Amino acid sequence: MFGLGGQELVLILLIILLLFGAKKLPELARGLGRGMKEFKKAQTEIEEEFNKVVEEPPAKEKTTT
């Protein structure tokens, strides 16, 4: 996961705990979860729109004589 080992993750979590305190962690995690959910939703919408555009047959060209 991003090239981080177990020790690095534990160290990062300890720093976050020291910076924000135990009382704020659930609130931070909730906000992070909501943000990730919104990001994934937007990503899915963009992928669906892209697939619609790619799968549409090309418009027929008008020929002039």
UniProtKB/Swiss-Prot annotation:
This is Sec-independent protein translocase protein TatA. The lineage of its organism: Bacteria, Pseudomonadati, Chlorobiota, Chlorobiia, Chlorobiales. It is a single-pass membrane protein. It holds the Pfam family TatA_B_E. Its main location: membrane. One of its GO terms (biological process) is protein transport by the Tat complex. It comes from the Bacteria. Part of the twin-arginine translocation (Tat) system that transports large folded proteins containing a characteristic twin-arginine motif in their signal peptide across membranes. TatA could form the protein-conducting channel of the Tat system. Keywords: Cell inner membrane, Cell membrane, Membrane, Protein transport, Translocation, Transmembrane, Transmembrane helix, Transport. The chain crosses the membrane at residues 1-21. It is found in: Cell inner membrane. GO terms for molecular function: protein transmembrane transporter activity. One of its GO terms (cellular component) is TAT protein transport complex. It comes from Chlorobium phaeobacteroides (strain DSM 266 / SMG 266 / 2430). PANTHER family: SEC-INDEPENDENT PROTEIN TRANSLOCASE PROTEIN TATA. Forms a complex with TatC. The keyword Cell membrane applies. Belongs to the TatA/E family.
